[in-house]
Every structure is written in structure tokens, then in C-alpha cells.
């Protein structure tokens, strides 16, 4: 060994640590380039800052981060014109793992979830060592700005490194990776281009990838969200929107602002103009990208709640460390404040745009079911979300809102009535609506998959309770029906009791009702439990506690009047048929379809005198 080459040992645990970095992160090893580029960009920012007080540190006009693959030599070189390092800096900065949390890093990396491991290497200050995931030897040649000396640090990742004098024409750093046999992809300029766009597209430092001996720009270099709104054109907004989410439409809304004060961040968010191809029902996590100092960190920071997961875009802050695990992100107070602020801004935008009924309609038809989830997921914002909801109605065409419904309530009406079913078209002809329509009472018609859940969570709106009309205990007697109504037949009480006996445990009760006009029977739920739609969902899921429905009978219907006067021996078969009719009206099948078909056929034959 030359006398000018110094050999240093990392420390007893470093061999194990490097082994962990290389093997535990193998599937995510592309992040090595993110780490090296982030370090290079930071070095150039530091030099730019130092130049404010030292002319000797001024950056050259063409300063950039340069990524140069060499297929013949099988090397990848990342160069920068940054602040550079002295011999002592190299020993300290690239040797810190010997004395700064090696054991803690090793233990944390071993116990961390696979998806959190990539960010841990930066969190513990060992991001540089991710280079050994793709290289079996790494050399770093650096010259500190303001110094004439350059030094080369070299290691094979086996627990030791060397330092020796070197030459470098200008201040800055060259990191040369001697690539492993299975790392050929990082010799391809197109692959390097892709990684730069993925991880560092918007950092302000220019990044070039060398292709056929020429430097080609690989990043935009301008963070659009960092610009003032007045400096950005609609075309630029659209181009960025298309690039971040593979969108081909125009955004329905663009939100661009900068928060300043105790918490500082920039945000550029988009609400799409159409539903995405992938189902929002299957993917419930927000994918807004988190950047720290323009460097992409993750799109899994859950910057927005699941009920706003249709929003796309970027939030960039300097109030978070550049590298932090997702697990630690969730408990970071600064991130919690960012989430609250960003969520509030999106809700405020929706509130403003909801005043334009026609414009808001397209948003609602695309993302309404997702927004409804906020009612039962976000107690704090429930009151802000409720006025944004839109519904079909038994009384008006098109969409209506809860405030509009309340403004149309009849004198003496105390509740907001709604009906939930799977089929929007079936709702309009549901017998559940007959008594309400006949009395001029409006009912909201709900058919989204979330509608069985949120009304009970909201409870009230503007002091008015929300009531499912399929629940028992609704008293409509204060609202008179138009026209003269026939009296209930004699013997109706005995008939109802006989039907209840005949059906037994298949129903929880049988009773007369004033909610029907044209139909003979209808199902309802008990007043204290879940409504019919929730009971139906519980049965489909095999959950206990769904209970049995109540069979309500219209005593003024011709069929019921006739059955009430029929011999008692006919009640058991009639009771089963009435229950099947009610089930069919409610969107369910008869208990025994074949038996029901025979009953109907026999009744038709009898009616024809056959």
C-alpha cells in the first residue's frame, strides 16, 4: 500500500449493518440514486448559501448534478459542483455509521415493515451506503470550495475504507459506483432518466444524464407549486396534472397556494374532471405526493383522509426531515398540522363551488359516494361535509341538498325522511313512498353503497333528525290524506293476529299501517334497530343481530279487506303469500320461489275459472 493511502476501520458492527442495507432493501434498491442525488443537490444548495458571504464559493453558471453511466468500465458516476468535502469531512461524514446509531439502525431495520425500510436509511444518516446495494466498490473524490486539496475515499463495503490525496479541477464531489453484475439496468440512460423523473424531477438543481457522450437534461428543475399562481398558465397546470396521475381530462378544480407562518408548505392539488379508471372503492388511501424541499419522499403519507382520496397533487414542505419512515411520519406533529390545513382547504373549495349547482353536479356524480364516507369517518368535519351532499328526491327533479330539503319541509314536519335501497330506479316506485307522497312529504332517495351507514352517524341536520322511512314508529297521522278514505274492515285485528301466528319467527311483528295507499303490504324495521337496508347488508355478510322485519298491512286495500272476511283456514297460505309479496316489493326473493310461483299460478287459474 502506498504511504499516502490511509486505511480506517468503520467499527465492529458496520459489516452487519452494510449487510442489512444491501439485503433488507434489495427490492427497493433503486432508491440509491435518490439518496445520492439528494446529497448532491443539498451540497450545491449549501455552496450557494455559503457564496452569499464568500465569493470563493460561488457556483459556476453551468453547475449541475451529472449522472454518467460507463458500460465499458461498468461504472456509474454521480458528480456535483457542491460545497465539497475536506479529508476530515470525508472521514466524518462517510464514517459516521461507526459512531452514530449503528446498533439502533440495525435493530430498527430488522424489525421494520418492508415498505418502511427504504426511508429508514436516510433517517439514520446512512443513505450514502445504499450505494452498496448496487455496487461492490464505491469511490468518492471531493474538493472543498475554497480549498486546493482533493481527497478520495474508497470502500468495498466490507467494514473499512481508505483515504488518499487526489486531484479535482473544481470544487465538488464525484461518486463512482463500480456496479455489481446484476445491476446492469443502472448503466442504461433511459432507466436513469426514469428514476430522476420519479424521485427528483422538481428539485431546482439541474440534473443531467449522459447519453452518447452528451449531457441531457433529466429533470424539470422548476417546482410548479413553488411559483406564484400569477406565474403559472392554465396549460402548465394541465400539463402537470396529466403528468402526476396519468390523467387525460381537464381538472375540475385546481388548488394552488402557499401556507406561511408557524407552518410553511406549498400545495398544488387537483380534483379530476372524471372518475379514474381504477375503482376508488378498492383503493382507499390518498395518493397526494409529499415532497420535502422539492425532493419526492412518498405518496403514502396520507396527506388527505380517505374520503378525499380522489384529490391528486403535491404538498412540499421544509418543516419535515428529508428522510423519515412512514411510521414516524404518522406521528409527526408538523405533518398532522399539514394534513389538517390541506383537508380544510379542499373542503373550503368544495363549499365555494357547491354554490354553482350546475358545475357542482359533475363533481358529485363522479365523487359523491366517496365524499359521503366523511360523514361516518370524520367526526370533526361532519358538519362541514353534510351541506356538500346531494341526493335524488321524491319531490323534485335532479339533485337536492339537505339545506334545500329543510327549506321545503311542511309545517309540523319534524324529521328529514330518507329511503335507502340498492337500485336507484326501484326507489322511485317503492311502496314505502306511497303514504309520504300522498301527504306531500318529501323523501330523500339514497342508493350509493355507503348510504346504509352514514345517516345514523350524522343523526341530525339543522336540528332535524334524519329518519329512515323503513323504520317502524313513524306517525304520519298529523298529515291528512287527500280525499275520503275507506274505513278499516271489521275483523282486521283478528286477521292481523292470525297472520302473525301463521308467520311465527319469520317476522318480528305484524301490524296495520297508514303509510300505504296503493299497496297491500310492506316490510319495515323495528323502531330501535337498523333499518331494512342495513338488516339486508348484515344478512348478506352473515352477521348476527340483523333481526326479522315487521310486516305492515294496509287495512283499506281491497285484497286485505277480502282476506279479513275469508275463512280462518285460508289465513296460513295467505300470510305466506303476503310476506313474499312484501319481500319482492323490497327487492328480495320469495322465501320459496317455486312454491310462490305455484300459488300465483293457482290464483290466476281460479280467477279465470279454470
Swiss-Prot record:
CDD domains documented for this protein: HATPase_Hsp90-like (cd16927)
SUPFAM superfamilies associated with the record: ATPase domain of HSP90 chaperone/DNA topoisomerase II/histidine kinase, HSP90 C-terminal domain, Ribosomal protein S5 domain 2-like
Record keywords, A-Z: ATP-binding, Chaperone, Cytoplasm, Nucleotide-binding, Stress response
Region named B: 327-536
Localization in the cell: Cytoplasm
Region (C): 537-610
GO cellular component, one term: cytoplasm
One GO molecular-function entry: ATP hydrolysis activity
Name of this chain's protein: Chaperone protein HtpG
